[in-house]
Amino acid sequence: MSIEEEDTNKITCTQDFLHQYFVTERVSIQFGLNNKTVKRINKDEFDKAVNCIMSWTNYPKPGLKRTASTYLLSNSFKKSATVSLPFILGDPVCMPKRVESNNNDTCLLYSDTLYDDPLIQRNDQAGDEIEDEFSFTLLRSEVNEIRPISSSSTAQILQSDYSALMYERQASNGSIFQFSSP
């Protein structure tokens, strides 16, 4: 296989690898969102993101998934969005202890939505083997104070922020992002 073919194959694999971590149309419908609230990132945008990401990280390290999400979010929108992303074990960047606001600027909130303390405490033993069994939700919302995040309070925080997010979406026509099929 030539170097060019290897690069092409690598990018294709990376696309497949990243696709699964964004909300699907079914999830959009579940939350009562119509087509106008779903922004699809087209193949050209996605390919561009993948190429940039691959120059920053070595596939398939866990950081690739978060970098992809961050790149696409920061370069694709200014409005509120809810995006399904991978939960990366042992990655402090993904699970900050708190969320701080800076003069009411928009903040990013990462929350574990699927598992409780005992499973999270398996961090060291579980490692990468169960990485793909996890997910977390990134909520982009305006917060006015520092709020601690813990597994026991996550559901309440998530529900509160999602309600605020949906209200803001109705007011500003924010979007839920997903990748369109290749």
From Swiss-Prot:
GO terms for cellular component: condensed nuclear chromosome. InterPro entries: Rec104. The keyword Transcription regulation applies. Keywords: Activator, Meiosis, Transcription, Transcription regulation. Signal peptide: none annotated. One of its GO terms (biological process) is reciprocal meiotic recombination. Pfam families: REC104. Potential transcriptional regulator that is required to activate expression of a number of early meiotic genes including HOP1. Interacts with REC114 and SPO11. This is Meiotic recombination protein REC104. It comes from Saccharomyces cerevisiae (strain ATCC 204508 / S288c) (Baker's yeast).
